[in-house]
């Protein structure tokens, strides 16, 4: 198992409010995680208790654990990971993603 840490990455949302799927791509200067991708499936539970809040004065951080996701997969190489983080599975609105800085921990 390899554990990698990426800080200060920027997440760009790729989905509209109430869409069925939401995709994220993390851009990092670290080549190993330059193509790190996280996807989540939206549902109607509106349970974002695991999603950190954001404010202009304090950046938000979230952790992605591929080891806790039943949908985690590794696509052949260390620079192309696709996971469904447990912390992002139960949101119902893309508008809840009002932050863009993440602390990513990935176990593969």
From Swiss-Prot:
Lineage: Eukaryota, Amoebozoa, Evosea, Eumycetozoa, Dictyostelia
Organism for this UniProt entry: Dictyostelium discoideum
Biased composition regions of type Low complexity, renumbered to the chain: 48-73
Domain of life where this protein originates: Eukaryota
UniProt name for this protein: Uncharacterized protein DDB_G0290437
Annotated segments matching region Disordered: 48-81
């Amino acid at each position: 198992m390899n554990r990698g840490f990426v800080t200060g990455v920027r997440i760009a949302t790729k989905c509209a409010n109430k869409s069925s799927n939401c995709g994220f791509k993390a851009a990092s200067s670290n080549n190993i995680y330059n193509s790190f991708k996280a996807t989540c499936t939206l549902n109607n539970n509106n349970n974002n208790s695991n999603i950190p809040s954001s404010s202009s004065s304090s950046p938000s951080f979230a952790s992605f654990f591929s080891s806790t996701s039943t949908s985690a997969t590794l696509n052949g190489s260390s620079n192309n990971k696709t996971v469904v983080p447990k912390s992002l599975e139960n949101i119902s609105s893309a508008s809840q993603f009002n932050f863009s800085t993440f602390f990513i921990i990935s176990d593969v």
